[in-house]
């Protein structure tokens, strides 16, 4: 990295070297520990020695690095975080790392889906079992006959149903096909009917897919 930064600084007149940054979690699932972020600071100092000036930006990662700020142990020298999810949602630090963000709205994005079927059905599929539409072998628990609802959305819209957070805490998402989602509402005090709207909170991955889906209507509400 030092050589690349020096090349930009010294030979690429149409580019300005503003700083250096790191991405730890998006692919490699590396935790942004103080030690890992200190490696970035050390690289930044080597770059500064090479180019003979201070860097404007030393970016310590994205939303997953914000827990270092909350713990008060982010290394000195990091002056930037590229935070998006924790401002817009915020859910990931709470559900994935156990860090609540007090004072932040967690309902900026709400997914709404319509109920298109309500029926009592066996909880364990009837027949010889193989794989689902995506080549997986789901595990089913026999709970007898359960009240199930079918929603008009599926894997194509939000990627992974396990990352949907129902606002009704008494329902269970059982699974999905490419364009439908199945929920168990047997234990819910609310009685569900065809045409009802079910609401979900989102985390980063589901929100990413929904925002890019042409099948999902986006409604912007300005309370002011």
Language model segments and positions:
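C-terminal accessory subdomain/extension
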Residues: 125-224
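Active-site loop ensemble at the mouth of alpha/beta enzyme cores that anchors a bound cofactor
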Residues: 66-151, 157, 164
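Active-site loop/helix belt of alpha/beta enzymes
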Residues: 1-109
């Amino acid at each position: 990295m030092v050589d690349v930064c020096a090349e930009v600084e010294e030979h690429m007149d149409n580019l300005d070297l503003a700083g250096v940054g790191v991405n730890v979690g998006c692919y490699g699932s590396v935790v942004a520990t103080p030690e890992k972020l200190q490696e970035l600071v050390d690289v930044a100092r080597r770059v500064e020695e090479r180019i003979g000036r201070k860097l404007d930006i030393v970016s310590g990662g994205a939303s997953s690095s914000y827990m270092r700020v909350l713990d008060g142990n982010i290394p000195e020298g990091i002056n930037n975080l590229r935070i998006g999810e924790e401002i817009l949602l915020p859910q990931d630090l709470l559900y994935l790392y156990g860090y609540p963000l007090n004072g932040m709205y967690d309902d900026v994005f709400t997914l709404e889906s319509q109920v298109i079927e309500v029926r009592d059905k066996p909880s364990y599929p009837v027949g010889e079992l193989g794989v689902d539409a995506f080549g997986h072998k789901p595990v089913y628990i026999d709970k007898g006959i359960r009240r199930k609802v079918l929603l008009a959305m599926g894997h194509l819209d939000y990627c992974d149903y396990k990352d949907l957070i129902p606002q009704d805490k008494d329902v269970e998402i059982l699974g999905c096909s490419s364009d439908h989602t199945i929920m168990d509402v047997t234990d819910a005090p609310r009685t569900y009917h065809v045409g009802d709207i079910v609401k979900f909170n989102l985390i980063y991955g589901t929100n990413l897919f929904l925002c890019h889906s042409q099948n999902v209507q986006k409604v912007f509400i300005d309370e002011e």
